[in-house]
Amino acid sequence: MKNIKAIIFDAYGTLFDVNSAAEKCKDKIGDKWEGFANYWRTTQLEYTWLRSLMNRHKDFWQVTEDSLDKSMKVSQIDPSMRNELLDLYKILSPFEEVPEVLKSLKEKNYKLSILSNGTPALLNELVESNKLNNLFHKLSWLYPNYPQSLAKNLYVFSLNF
C-alpha cells in the first residue's frame, strides 16, 4: 500500500449509520423503528437514482426530506417527529469502528477524504458533530456545482487530493 496516498470514503451508510436518527427515536417510534429507518434509506436512494435518471436534480437534503415525508406516511409515524428526525440526520452517528480506523489511517499519513452527494454544510456538520474533522484532508461533494451525471463523473476524476 506504499503507493496509495489518499483514501476516499462515502459518508452516508459507509462512515455514518443512516439508521441512527430513527434509532435515537425508537422509544417514540416503537418496535417498527428499524423497518421505518430501512424504508427511509431505500426511498432516499430510489429518489436519488430516479431524479438523476430523469435529469431532475435535487440536492441531497431535499431528497432526504422528501423521502422522510413518504416514509413517515407509509410507516404511520407521528408527523410531529419530522423536525426531530431531520435534526438527528444532520448529526448521524458514525459506525462504531469508524473513529479508530480513521485515526489509524491518519497516523499512517494517508490523506483521508469524503466524497459525497451531501451538501458542504451537511458534511461539515456531520463530521464536526462527531469530532472527526481533524482526521480529514478534504471534504468533497458531487452535486452543488455538477448536477448532471456526466459532469459529476468527470468531476470525480479531476479531484486532486
Language model regions located:
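Short, acidic loop-to-helix structural element flanking the phosphoryl-transfer center
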Residues: 57, 61-62, 80-114, 121-124, ...
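A metal-dependent, Asp-based hydrolase signature
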Residues: 48-83
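Short helix-capping segments at alpha-helix termini
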Residues: 29-33, 74-80, 107-108, 131-135
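Substrate-recognition "cap/lid" segment bordering the active-site pocket of phosphatases
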Residues: 113-115, 119-161
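Active-site neighborhood of HAD-like aspartate-dependent phosphohydrolases
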Residues: 1-45
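Short, well-structured alpha-helical segments
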Residues: 34-41, 79-87
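An amphipathic alpha-helix signature
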Residues: 22-23, 37, 41, 61-69, ...
